[in-house]
Swiss-Prot record:
This is Tyrosine-protein phosphatase non-receptor type 5. The lineage of its organism: Eukaryota, Metazoa, Chordata, Craniata, Vertebrata. The keyword Transmembrane helix applies. It catalyses: O-phospho-L-tyrosyl-[protein] + H2O = L-tyrosyl-[protein] + phosphate. SMART domains: PTPc, PTPc_motif. It is found in: Endoplasmic reticulum membrane. GO terms for biological process: protein dephosphorylation; signal transduction. Residues 300-555 form the Tyrosine-protein phosphatase domain. The keyword Ribosomal protein does not apply. GO terms for cellular component: cell junction; cytosol; endoplasmic reticulum membrane; membrane; nucleoplasm; plasma membrane.
Length: 565
């Protein structure tokens, strides 16, 4: 019975811990009031995960399963089981038995009750004798003296026992099994702020793009309307934890199978709220509001953490061998907007897969950009297949080949190379202060096309730039190159390492620059939500979000100076 009670109590503790962990994550999604700004330690678009895993000690091997027939020891085993009350009762009983024994052996056994008064009087008289030598001289070491000695010794022993029990620390709670623990990891970052000016900046604005952590999954259910309510299909939907103390809701904007006729999709209130936020969030900024907001890191931080990340649950892609085509296992293309390669084998879904999404442009124009991950060795051929298939005229690369570890494979040739029948030739390389421009020709059969490859090299390792003009200059160069392609330019491919952080900054800046020129206002919040609908995690960190605001603030000042007075 005691074992069953202890086990029930441990299960209750485990349930409380699980609910507490979920509550911590839920509560950490939104930051209504923040006492201090934040600097998030981040690695570019999730590339630091491998380094952090390398530095962390390996987890201890799992303990062998215990014999189910062997019951665990009861709670409190091996520790003191005596309480204060039991000690006092023991003391009283021992003194009573001691008194009875002494009286019995001293001849008072038959009439001890009759001589109780005399015994007490003898004890009081004995206590009044202050001269201990008088006891020895007078020979009064009789029954009362022995009784007093035994009482004193017993009192000292029992008092010592009680004092020891009172000082004994309470028994620690029984540790829960590892599988019953739910921990809400909270990492509170710090923040360093500096103004983004064309002049030299004194303090760097640190930005390490966040490591992509494995999502923690809630459960939502897909259920047929006419089916038995007891037969439910449980489907995992992801919650991606942002680096820092904030958990961003991950919602799948197009779950495969949800739109099939005869099936209903039951969304959780949190997911429904996140979907509604991405579709409706907006904050139009006039020029003065833009400048003020760019200088308010607290407001930008709070606004950024309100935006759902919209990452994809890896379980959405049940394609064997898919891991070989993803640079990061948790950064996947959203299904509804992903690029599908033409494949000679329609029964092989892996041959048509590439980690890339179509991204809408200014005014919701479809397929203006393609956001993709930095190619890896096993996807270089797929990357060039996509370039040829989409008639891409421009590629923008915003990462170095290595930043602590490999961020992108050098997928272009020194002179010439061929992939799947497409001949790639580098015609010319132009070096500028902030980027390198390669003029490339693509040829397949008798068809030949031109391609411009911009490699932006001014983005510092492991942080955001401390100056906005280089990125603005690149955006303007790419816009002019796209205008030369005509009114119906094919999608512009933009990539970094994971294809969400720096890539999101570039595309958001390009869209907002067009909006600022056309409307005189800018809505960076709405633009960010639009990007995350198409590809989860775009503009990955708070620092990148602030950087986009500073770039747009600088661009608005440039436009106001260029406008006729």
């Amino acid at each position: 019975m005691n074992y069953e009670g202890a086990r029930s109590e441990r299960e209750n503790h485990a349930a409380d811990d699980s609910e507490g962990g979920a509550l911590d994550m839920c509560c950490s999604e939104r930051l209504p009031g923040l006492p201090q700004p934040i600097v998030m330690e981040a690695l570019d678009e999730a590339e630091g995960l491998q380094d952090s895993q390398r530095e962390m000690p390996p987890p201890p091997p799992p303990s062998p399963p215990s014999d189910p027939a062997q019951k665990p020891p009861p709670r409190g085993a091996g520790s003191h089981s005596l309480t204060v009350r039991s000690s006092l009762c023991l003391f009283a009983a021992s003194q009573f038995l001691l008194a009875c024994g002494v009286l019995w052996f001293s001849g008072y056994g038959h009439i001890w009750s009759q001589n109780a008064t005399n015994l007490v009087s003898s004890l009081l008289t004995l206590l009044k004798q202050l001269e201990p030598t008088a006891w020895l001289d007078s020979g009064t070491w009789g029954v009362p003296s022995l009784l007093l000695v035994f009482l004193s010794v017993g009192l000292v022993l029992v008092t010592t026992l009680v004092w020891h029990l009172l000082r004994t620390p309470p028994e620690p709670p029984t540790p829960l099994p590892p599988e019953d623990r739910r921990q809400s990891v909270s990492r509170q970052p710090s923040f360093t702020y500096s103004e983004w000016m064309e002049e030299k900046i004194e303090d760097d604005f640190l930005d390490l793009d966040p490591v992509p952590e494995t999502p923690v999954f809630d459960c939502v259910m897909d259920i047929k309307p006419e089916a038995d309510p007891t037969s439910l299909t449980v489907k995992s939907m992801g919650l991606q934890e942002r680096r820092g103390s904030n958990v961003s809701l991950t919602l799948d904007m197009c779950t495969p199978g949800c739109n099939e006729e005869g099936f209903g999709y039951l969304m959780s209130p949190r997911e429904e709220s996140a979907r509604e936020y991405l579709l409706s969030a907006s904050r139009v900024l006039q020029a003065e509001e833009l400048h003020e907001k760019a200088l308010d890191p607290f407001l930008l931080q709070a606004e950024f953490f309100e935006i759902p990340m919209n990452f994809v649950d890896p379980k959405e892609y049940d394609i064997p061998g898919l891991v070989r085509k993803n640079r990061y296992k948790t950064i996947l293309p959203n299904p509804h907007s992903r690029v599908c390669l033409t494949s000679p084998d329609p029964d092989d879904p892996l041959s048509s897969y590439i980690n890339a999404n179509y991204i809408r442009g200014y005014g919701g124009e479809e397929k203006v950009y393609i956001a993709t991950q930095g190619p890896i060795v096993s996807t270089v051929a797929d990357f060039w297949r996509m370039v040829w298939q989409e008639h891409t005229p421009i590629i923008v690369m915003i990462t170095n080949i290595e930043e602590m570890n490999e961020k992108c494979t050098e997928y272009w040739p020194e002179e010439q190379v061929a992939y799947d029948g497409v001949e790639i030739t580098v015609q010319k390389v132009i070096h500028t202060e902030d980027y390198r421009l390669r003029l490339i020709s693509l040829k397949s059969g008798t068809e030949e096309r031109g391609l411009k490859h911009y490699w932006f090299t001014s983005w510092p390792d492991q942080k955001t730039p401390d100056r906005a003009p280089p990125l603005l200059h690149l955006v303007r160069e790419v816009e002019e190159a796209a205008q030369q392609e005509g009114p119906h330019c094919a999608p512009i491919i933009v990539h970094c390492s994971a294809g969400i952080g720096r890539t999101g900054c570039f595309i958001a800046t390009s869209i907002c620059c067009q909006q600022l020129r056309q409307e005189g206002v800018v809505d960076i919040l709405k633009t960010t939500c639009q990007l995350r609908q198409d590809r989860g995690g775009m503009i990955q960190t708070c620092e990148q979000y602030q950087f986009v605001h500073h770039v747009m603030s600088l661009y608005e000042k440039q436009l106001s100076h260029q406008s006729p007075e």
